[in-house]
Design a protein with these regions (language model features):
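Active-site neighborhood of glycoside hydrolase catalytic domains
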Residues: 154-231
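Aromatic-lined ligand-binding clefts that engage carbohydrates, nucleic acids, or primary amines
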Residues: 421-436, 465, 532-556, 563-564, ...
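An active-site-proximal structural segment forming one wall of the substrate-binding cleft
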Residues: 103-120, 143-180
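Catalytic-core region of carbohydrate-active enzymes that cleave or remodel glycosidic bonds
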Residues: 208-209, 213, 242-337, 341, ...
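Aromatic- and acidic-residue-enriched segments that line the glycan-binding/catalytic groove
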Residues: 94-102, 113, 123-149, 199-204, ...
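N-terminal carbohydrate-binding accessory modules
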Residues: 26-79, 109
């Protein structure tokens, strides 16, 4: 959808971006060079210390990009690092989207307008606590395809993607006078495999895509450099607090000629549902940053600004046994918090960078205050059971991907002959299920807790079995990655007998759709609608989800993200540009909804509430 210039100007003002900057488009810019040489990085032949910070345009409302970039410049950074998430741009094979919040080229141009260079991480694998590590779910439709391998089917899909991305971004390299100084090949492959031929395949794809006028490089943990690097490219290293000196010592042993750079210095961490909010060691981080800068080493702080994994885009961790889905917020304890506000860490890092570089940064921009939205009564609702689409019938169970579905929920329905008593067993559940007998909730199963069995006692001669499954976020890192099909993978058995003959209902819920709400009571899996009025200029706010159980929230048709009463996150960030003066609509889908619930507005986030380990109740 195109937005008129005046509308964009209004959105820009909401994020506090009022200064005028010179346009880049159409300007004649001389070519420059950025290469690794003589043990360091060279910009136009002169030594250059990269002081970068990571933030992802997909996790930030477009109207706020410029505001966040100015905050980066004011902290003393000279570059911005960003992933490009493949699934964000190619939702279906051969269907590409670089519009609106997906306009990565405009994000790069805006960085240049703010005097920042750009380090690009196009993958094709990203990680980043993003669903499936940035891979599109449709790769899993072919059960024989193996991602991150030399499988010809995977390589063909990755090549087509990178060639298309090159059309957007290759013109924006430093060799063309634009801001992209470096492009990463794959991502931390040494923590996954050691196939150097595969890494060469990815490097060749990037070259063929036109990324020849910026410095290619690889990134790994220090000990994994031999497995994930390429001898002809610089290798940068990723590590966390307290590991700087040891990690660089290892890199020096492996790459005596340098250059020395931390591609990810972890200045925080992410949170999992049902686990405590991650503690922060700002003192150690300040010491590490100071030490690296004084050595003359380059660094990219991960994250400078985390933002939000809006909608269904959070990932998960797994070592092949456990499953740990990530929360919606990607605050990360970063210098700039989830809503773009500087934290004490921001000012501490700013002081260190200024001291160690001798460069005084621009003043820190003023940030508009937050607001408290009025309390919203979820007075209108409709049961999920009244909104089901036409099913697909299959004797065998099918995954989401087999039905061309990427996110949301999927319902499996079959008829049972009873009476029967025994365990309902799901071979492989991805990821959370509510089980119903004749429309009545019989129990839940949670992959996070290793649950895949539920005792049932069915007295009726005929009964309807419904298994409502949520894709809680595909694993984004580790050996489980290739098998991250969503839904039920494998068989379902009851009392030892395989169940066959299923009606399967895809429920992607990318938007709530046009539903027929009523004021009749609605309990169980229900959609609810409420409205509230903004009487002043919209400002950032937060929705308190403490009264809700498990599900998703949309604001004016935009998916804000997930909620789950297991904690630790109990608010959802509402960016000011997504609010409208006047009437605003909130839609909630709650797996265990109750009529009459309320959502309170808050002027601050709640990301560290007490956690529950048990399933949602």
């Amino acid at each position: 959808m195109m937005v008129r210039p005046r509308a964009w100007a209004w959105l820009v003002l909401l994020c506090g971006m009022v200064a005028t900057v010179p346009a880049v488009a159409g300007a004649q810019t001389p070519p420059h060079s950025f290469v690794a040489g003589h043990g360091q990085f060279l910009l136009d032949g002169k030594p250059f210390q990269v002081i970068s910070g990571e933030m992802h345009y997909a996790r930030i409302p477009r109207a706020c990009w410029r505001d966040r970039l100015r905050m980066a410049k004011a902290m003393g950074l000279n570059a911005i690092t960003t992933y490009v998430f493949w699934n964000w741009h190619e939702p279906e094979p051969g269907v590409y989207d670089f519009s609106g919040n997906r306009d990565v080229a405009e994000f790069v141009r805006e960085a240049q307008r703010e005097g920042l260079y750009v380090i690009l991480r196009p993958g094709p694998y990203s990680c980043a606590e993003w669903d499936f590590g940035g891979f599109p779910a449709w790769l899993l439709k072919d059960p024989t395809m193996v991602v991150r391998s030399r499988d010809p089917k995977f390589l063909a899909a990755a090549r087509a993607w990178l060639l298309r991305l090159g059309k957007e971004l290759a013109p924006l390299q430093i060799g063309n006078g634009r801001p992209i100084i470096a492009v990463q090949v794959e991502n931390e492959y040494g923590s996954y495999g050691d196939d150097h031929a595969y890494m060469e395949d990815i490097r060749r794809m990037l070259v063929d895509a036109g990324f020849t006028k910026a410095q290619l490089y690889t990134a790994d943990g220090a000990k994994q450099v031999p497995r994930g690097s390429l001898p002809e490219l610089p290798a940068v290293i990723n590590f966390g607090p307290g590991e700087a000196q040891k990690s660089f010592a290892t890199l020096k042993q492996l790459r005596q000629d340098g250059p020395m750079m931390s591609g990810e210095y972890w200045d925080g961490w992410f949170d999992h549902w049902g686990a405590p909010h991650t503690a922060d060691d700002a003192d150690q981080q300040a010491k590490d940053l100071d030490w690296m800068l004084r050595q003359g080493y380059s660094v990219s702080i991960y994250m400078f600004h985390g933002g939000t994994s809006f909608g269904w885009m959070n990932g998960a961790n797994s070592n092949g046994k456990n499953y740990e889905p990530d929360v919606t917020s990607y605050d990360y304890n970063a210098p700039l918090d989830e809503s773009g506000r500087p934290t004490p860490k921001y000012y501490r890092f700013r002081e260190i960078i200024a001291k160690d570089t001798g460069v005084t940064p621009p003043p820190v921009p003023a940030v508009p205050p937050t607001m408290t939205a009025p309390t919203m009564l979820l007075a209108e609702g409709i049961s999920l059971w009244k909104t089901l689409p036409a099913p697909t019938h299959s004797e065998q169970l099918l995954s989401m991907e087999a039905l061309n579905q990427a996110y949301g929920y999927i319902l499996y329905r079959t008829q049972l002959d009873g009476p029967v008593t025994g365990d309902l067993v799901i071979d492989t559940l991805h990821d959370y299920a509510q089980v119903y007998i004749n429309g009545k909730l019989a129990g839940t199963m949670d992959r996070r807790l290793g649950q895949h069995e539920l005792p049932l006692k069915i007295a009726a001669h005929h009964a309807r079995l419904d298994i409502l499954v949520e894709n809680t976020g595909r694993v984004n890192f580790g050996p489980a990655l290739p098998g991250e099909h969503a839904g039920i993978v494998g068989r379902v058995r009851l009392a030892g007998k395989p169940l066959m003959g299923w009606d399967i209902y895809p429920l992607p819920m990318l938007t709530p759709g046009d539903l027929r709400y009523s004021k009749q009571p609605c309990d169980g899996p229900c959609f609810y609608r409420a409205t509230f009025t903004v009487t002043t200029t919209p400002k950032d706010t937060f929705l308190n989800t403490s009264a809700l159980t498990k599900g998703e929230v949309w604001l004016n048709g935009r998916a804000l993200g997930r909620f789950w009463n297991v904690g630790p996150q109990k608010t959802l960030y509402v960016p000011a540009p997504w609010l409208k003066p006047g009437r605003n609509e909130v839609v909630v889908f709650d797996l265990k909804g109750k009529s009459g619930q309320k959502i309170e507005g808050l002027d601050h986030p709640v990301l560290h509430a007490a956690v529950l380990r048990s399933p949602a109740e």
